[in-house]
């Protein structure tokens, strides 16, 4: 299983993009939640509220998901990165694979 993490400016955008990725069957599901972020941007420290999302997919869909997320993302320089999960309940992995077919 592959987890793709990204942040968004607000709940609406996180849910909108999550829905589009579901409709394209690039992900089986996603989780979105409010976060507080601190980061450097254009020479200044910024602290802000954002929304994060974790998108769940298969290794076969990872590249296509990454490219589509980059295309849809509203940020100039979005945080988008993947994590490979080694141990997944077999039944869950079967459901995930079936969901992105």
UniProtKB/Swiss-Prot annotation:
Tell me, how does this one assemble?
A: Homotrimer.
Q: Which Gene Ontology BP annotations are present?
A: response to metal ion
Looking up InterPro entries in the UniProt record yields: CutA_tolerance, Ion_tolerance_CutA, N-reg_PII-like_a/b, N-reg_PII/ATP_PRibTrfase_C
Q: What is this protein called?
A: Divalent-cation tolerance protein CutA
The record's NCBIfam families line, in alphabetical order, gives:
dival_cat_tol_CutA
| Keyword Transcription regulation among UniProt keywords | no
UniProt entry tagged with the keyword Cytoplasm: yes
Look up the domain of life of the source. Answer: Bacteria
- Organism, as annotated: Thermotoga maritima (strain ATCC 43589 / DSM 3109 / JCM 10099 / NBRC 100826 / MSB8)
One GO cellular component term of this record is: cytoplasm
